[in-house]
A protein has these predicted regions:
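Rossmann-like S-adenosyl-L-methionine
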Residues: 1-189
């Protein structure tokens, strides 16, 4: 849209989306789940499976998972390379320590041990470097969220120190072949 000589981009307009008791800001230039009811169930499931006081949210997007811990006495690290997503993440999850970087590059330079790592990679899945870093950091639990069962299966097979203990599918797009899968991974004993 144009207003006089100045371009007025719809992409920069934010909308507030309430999921459960959390208010998120999103825009048309970023991804946000459209099925709020099932998203709320998935977020509750993720939150109830987090362990410890320190959490890393890799591929954090607009802070969907980081925002679960607003106001709690936890240390949250959010890593996202997309600038617009990170701007919204800082608003949605103000208590998270946010980093604008590629997850593998950030992990090599600044990664650290945390209790739980939440990963929600794009459809292409995790970089092998990220899997290696996760095993190096040795978190107590990894929560892997995937929208692509093929890359999720591939990624899970590449872990040598972790194994899935529980897998739950959320049909966020009823009537289509697209689902979100949450895999809980624990260290092998």
């Amino acid at each position: 849209m144009f207003s006089g000589d100045k371009e007025d981009s719809m992409d920069d307009r934010c909308v507030e989306i309430t999921v459960g008791d959390i208010k998120y800001l999103a825009s048309s230039s970023v991804f946000f789940q459209s099925n709020k009811k099932l998203l709320s169930e998935m977020l509750s499931y993720v939150k109830e499976n987090v362990v410890g006081e320190s959490i890393m949210d890799l591929y954090s997007g607009v802070g969907t998972f980081s925002a679960l811990f607003n106001g709690e006495n936890k240390t949250i690290y959010a890593v996202e390379r997309e600038r617009k997503c990170l701007e919204l993440s800082r608003k949605n999850a103000p208590s998270a320590i946010s980093f604008s970087d590629d997850c593998a590059r950030w992990g090599k330079n600044k990664g650290k041990h945390v209790d739980t790592v939440i990963v929600d990679p794009p459809r292409t899945g995790l970089d092998k470097e990220v899997i290696s870093l996760l095993e190096e950091w040795k978190p107590e639990k990894i929560i892997y969220i995937s929208c692509n069962p093929v890359t999720a299966s591939r990624d899970l097979s590449l872990f040598s120190l972790y194994a899935p203990t529980k897998v739950k599918v959320f049909d966020l797009y009823p009537g289509s072949s697209h689902t979100e899968t949450v895999c809980l991974l624990s260290r092998n004993k």
